[in-house]
Amino acid sequence: MMVKAVKKKTVTKINKKTSAPAAVKIKSRRLSPLADIDPDNAVQVLNRLWEVVMQRRDADPAVSHSARLLSRGIGKVAQKFGEEAVECLIEAVSGDKEALIGESADVLYHLLVLWVAVGVEPAEVWRELTKREGISGIAEKASRAKILPRAAGLKTTKIP
C-alpha cells in the first residue's frame, strides 16, 4: 500500500519591515493510502482550488501568493507555470518520485492560476477531455483542422 506525503503550510511571524507575513515554512505530513482517494473527489479538489484562486485574485498581493501572481500579468503567470513545468520534468527524469509528486501539485496549482488569468473555467477543460476520451491520440490529432503557416507577405502556403 502506497502512502504519499504532502506539504503542509504554517505561517511564521510578521515581517516588521514590510508589515506583510513572513515566508511560509513547509513541512510534510502523511496522507491516507492512495487506495482511499476517489477519482471524482480529485476533480472536486481541483475545482475547489480554482475557486480559491478566483476568490484571491482581488486579495492583497502582499498577503496572497495567487493575488501577487495574478497582479503581475499573464506574462509572469505563464512564466511561473513554465518554470514549475520544467521543475516537474527535471524530477521525472531524476527519478525522485516524491519530488515529482510535489512538483506535479505545483504545476496543477499554477495551471489553475493561468486559467483564472485568462478566464478559463475547469468545466471547459473537463468537457474537452471528455470529448477526447476513448479517441486514440493519433486519431484525435488527425481529426484537427490543418493550419499551414504563411511567410510574411505571401498569399499562399505553397512552396515556390
From Swiss-Prot:
EC number per UniProt: 3.6.1.31
Which keywords, in A-to-Z order, does the entry hold?
Amino-acid biosynthesis, ATP-binding, Cytoplasm, Histidine biosynthesis, Hydrolase, Nucleotide-binding
Enzyme class of the recorded protein, top EC level: hydrolase
Identify the pathway.
Answer: Amino-acid biosynthesis; L-histidine biosynthesis; L-histidine from 5-phospho-alpha-D-ribose 1-diphosphate: step 2/9
The protein's location, in the record's own words, is:
Cytoplasm
Q: Which GO terms describe its cellular component?
A: cytoplasm
Q: Which domain of life is it from?
A: Bacteria
Q: Which GO terms describe its molecular function?
A: ATP binding; phosphoribosyl-ATP diphosphatase activity
Q: Identify the CDD domains for this entry.
A: NTP-PPase_HisIE_like (cd11534)
The chemistry this enzyme catalyses reads: 1-(5-phospho-beta-D-ribosyl)-ATP + H2O = 1-(5-phospho-beta-D-ribosyl)-5'-AMP + diphosphate + H(+)
Keyword field contains Chloroplast? no
Q: Name one GO biological process term.
A: L-histidine biosynthetic process
PANTHER family documented for this protein: HISTIDINE BIOSYNTHESIS BIFUNCTIONAL PROTEIN, HISTIDINE BIOSYNTHESIS BIFUNCTIONAL PROTEIN HIS7
What family classification does the UniProt entry report for this protein? Belongs to the PRA-PH family.
Cite the HAMAP family for this sequence.
HisE
Q: What is this protein called?
A: Phosphoribosyl-ATP pyrophosphatase
Gene source species: Granulibacter bethesdensis (strain ATCC BAA-1260 / CGDNIH1)
Gene of this entry: hisE
